[in-house]
Amino acid sequence: MYKKQRIRTHPRSGISSDYLCLVCHKKGIYLGNNAISKNLIMVNRSELLNGNSFITGVSGSGKSMLAKQDIVNLYLSDKNADIIVIDPEREYKIVEALGGERIILSATSKHHINAMDMNRDYGDGENPLILKSEFILSLCEQLIGRLDLKQKSVIDRCTKIAYRGYLMNGCEGEVPTLKDLRKVLLEQPEVEAQEIALAIELFVDGSLDTFAKPTNVDTKNRFICYDIHDLGKQMMPIGMLVVLDSILNRITSNRAKGRSTYVFLDEIYLLFKHEYSADFLFTLWKRVRKYGAFITGITQNIEDMLQSHTARTMLANSELVVMLNQAATDREKLAELMGISELQLSYITNAEAGHGLVKIGGALVPFVNHLPKDTELYRLMSTKAFE
């Protein structure tokens, strides 16, 4: 809930001459303290119209620390919530500390995620194969370029054939892989089928076949970290798509069980560098609310990210945006996008780590968040070399 609290305010607050918003949602998670009133800021994303969020700030501003603190608070306070992280820099030591599963993805990794994994709840109440076929088409386009109608028809037909036994068994048992799909393609009479099979060979039966094998990691752990640090340029575009689809599988499965899912996408701008992962993320971003899921994007590259219309729309429509210390050009972009005044911008100008401005619904609140350095939790969260 939001309350208007009459207090004496400093003139640089920029919030109101004599009122501040007191943010204290029922079952809220600690975000920090109001920089003016010192009141706790407790946020429950399910209370917002759109529970997705962003954490932004320059390197060293404290965004990683804030995200990890949010993860720990969610993990410990809500036993009915699962956490998923995409980690490009291998910075989330808290995964192992909390008994989570780190899935290391690369061309040489022993960990594998099957690109064709599909649970019975994948289809949003409809035939799951319809939605999965769309994903397979996007995956193939990412691998070989734009597809014409003949190619799309062939892939759709072969996808149905590959999944036939799995669907007849009620989505139980052995899930087909891209190797099975390619085998079906090679059995088709059309020239297009043979061309597609050849085009995807490198990623199915060649050196980069890590997503064409059965999943061999625990994707049901309460805390999953997709470690993409070693994924490489060749595999990054397809890897991003497969990881996002794996996350969708978990979200839809959790919805059927009545569980919440919190997804943290570190360096989210990486997803916007590739058309198909950006489109998939945008669709996921719009849909997850009804699935009981919430996505947080973390980035220091606001100006670059906002060159994507998709990213701009997502940021503008987010009800929770945490802004830490910002570069000058990023401050200008944020002010334009969110209507932030010069006075309010002072809270994200040369700000100390953990200090900033947070947009919560229609409120803009200056905040501070400090975690004592003499704690094991701080040491687990810190990304500083000698801490």
Q: Which ranges hold each PLM region?
A:
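Post-Walker A helix-loop "phosphate-sensing" segment adjacent to the P-loop in P-loop NTPases
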Residues: N73-I84, L98, N249
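Hydrophobic positions on the alpha1 helix immediately C-terminal to the Walker A/P-loop
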Residues: L66
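H-loop/switch region of ABC-family ATPase nucleotide-binding domains
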Residues: T299
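Conserved lysine of the Walker
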Residues: K63
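Short coil/loop residues immediately preceding or within conserved phosphate-binding loops
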Residues: N50
